[in-house]
């Protein structure tokens, strides 16, 4: 690590974090070193932001597990809340016409998909690939009992096309790794100028135009009056690239995609080893010692 990078790290005021594949290990648990280091950052006055493709309701539960009080940027930045109880900093949703067009294209594709709006996840085409239902939706239908999943999952086409397409933050097409259907979908929707990303090799995410994790970092820096050069961001997948590019100190996980590592200034150890926490303790928190 260069002296220049060390000097920049000493000035970090905001830590922006992806969740899956970054803060979480492969068993969807948070390594103790990650919890400990983030709590220490918070105690020392640094701002924390969880920036994920996950829903706000789920991220709120994750923040509790981590024992921190971060800003929550859900659905890749479509909804940004100052904390568990708000207030709302920024919110971007599809228009009804946009949502109908995306939903119709997804239905016609024959791919399993989800639509996310406040407090609800609507499932589309569940009968097409029933094996994907339990993997991605956990329970069909009804409210998930696990307190980390406090939102209603809806498996009802009438409700999807009724209430479900008002105020949608994100659509997600789900399939097997590198499903060719993802590219076909993106091509069919290319003239809508949507924001498109992938949180894994098994999905393709569609958000309103201009919404991505980099947008979330920019919004937070304006809100908090923090220069982007004083942001350290951690990520592993291609949907994290805009966030890393918006941060002065982009950190990619060792388990991350090569394209993500290419934009990083620092590589963190594997997520299963608590790579985020190890980097924070070695390079950010030690400045106070």
Regions found by a protein language model. Give the residues of each.
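Short, structured coil segments at secondary-structure junctions
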Residues: 66-68, 75-76, 84, 189-192, ...
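Anion (oxyanion) recognition and catalysis
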Residues: 39-43, 107, 190, 245, ...
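Mg2+-dependent phosphoryl-transfer enzymes with acidic/Ser/Thr/Gly-rich catalytic loops
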Residues: 5-14, 30-31, 204-289
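Active-site metal-binding loops of divalent metal-dependent hydrolases
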Residues: 21, 54, 77, 235-237
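Conserved acidic, metal-coordinating active-site core of Asp-based
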Residues: 105, 109, 116-234, 243
């Amino acid at each position: 690590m260069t002296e220049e990078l060390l000097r920049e790290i000493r000035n970090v005021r905001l830590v922006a974090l992806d969740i899956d594949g970054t803060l979480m290990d492969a068993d969807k648990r948070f390594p103790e070193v990650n919890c400990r280091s983030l709590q220490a950052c918070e105690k020392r006055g640094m701002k924390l932001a969880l920036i994920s493709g996950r829903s706000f309701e789920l991220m709120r539960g994750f923040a509790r597990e981590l024992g921190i009080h971060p800003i929550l940027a859900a659905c890749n930045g479509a909804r940004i809340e100052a904390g568990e109880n708000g207030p709302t900093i920024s919110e971007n949703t599809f228009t009804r016409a946009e949502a109908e067009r995306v939903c119709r294209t997804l239905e016609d594709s024959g791919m399993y998909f989800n639509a996310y709006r406040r407090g609800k996840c609507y499932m589309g085409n569940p009968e097409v690939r029933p094996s994907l239902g339990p993997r991605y939706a956990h329970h069909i239908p009804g409210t998930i009992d696990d307190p980390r999943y406090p939102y209603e999952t809806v498996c009802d086409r009438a409700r999807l096309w009724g209430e479900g397409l008002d105020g949608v933050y994100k659509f997600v097409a789900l399939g097997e790794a590198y499903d060719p259907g993802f590219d076909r979908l993106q091509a069919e929707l290319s003239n809508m100028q949507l924001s498109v990303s992938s949180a894994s090799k098994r999905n393709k995410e569609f958000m309103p135009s201009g919404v991505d994790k980099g947008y979330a970092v920019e919004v937070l820096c304006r809100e908090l009056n923090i220069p982007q050069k004083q942001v350290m961001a951690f990520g592993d997948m291609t949907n994290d690239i805009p966030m890393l590019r918006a941060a002065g100190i982009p950190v990619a996980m060792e388990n991350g995609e090569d394209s993500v590592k290419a934009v990083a200034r620092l590589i963190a150890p594997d997520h299963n080893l608590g790579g985020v926490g190890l980097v924070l303790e070695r390079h950010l928190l030690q400045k106070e010692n």
